[in-house]
């Protein structure tokens, strides 16, 4: 039995390594690129190899360490294949050691209209269960495994329904001033099942979240900023550049410190603040022994920027 388990483990390990190697190798073809405005065309789309990406998902690598994920919705309907493709890219972000942060944006005039495509989602709506998918991280974060690396999102136009829940799952959020938000599932005979009943309430407060979820009313980028849902509001067309600016700052910071910061905050949400408090000093002691911590002092002494390696 042990030999069978070992062989299964080896096959799974090789399968994951092959997936990462194929996808990362394709990403490397993009090289290092400079920031691009949203109305400009970046380098040609990078073929993803295995697994195949939906036609409406575009991926590029920026500066070697930033994963750019561009989605294009041809209609307000969200197909299951698009969600699975995005989830596999988030898995890549977490498991490729050279990637430090992701940026999610839209290639079209709208982010995501957010109505689930009835045909492709029929099995999920019938069984109440998401299909088991290998090398996948749920984009809205409602089931484990959860994303471990930072994600910045840039939105414009419609950011509604499932699109708003995808937006809420990001760590830092940028919106163009023309963004129209909505969480109006109650007007279509169901409810926000992609995490908004938890994340929207947590981010904006009970009354603010319920005011929009129970009525289905739209709200603006300025209102989203007032509610604390958005960290930056930009003129239309500048939201992606701002998101990349934020991502670049994250990418040069110490990866171990970034991970510990996210872990601590998430532990407080999932396990309570006492558990998060208890883990603070042990985690600090662990990071104090890291090479990145020593690199900070070396860089300080040598009067240069630190080059953190995540070790």
Regions found by a protein language model. Name each.
Residues 1-14:
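N-terminal secretory signal peptides
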Residues 14-26:
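N-terminal export leaders
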Residues 19-22, 36-52, 298-311:
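Terminal low-complexity tails and localization/encapsulation signals of metabolic enzymes
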Residues 49, 143-256, 295-298:
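Crotonase-fold acyl-CoA enzyme core
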Residues 51, 85, 106-146, 159, ...:
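Glycine- (often His-adjacent) and acidic-residue-rich active-site loop
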Residues 69, 86, 104, 167, ...:
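Terminal peptide-recognition signature
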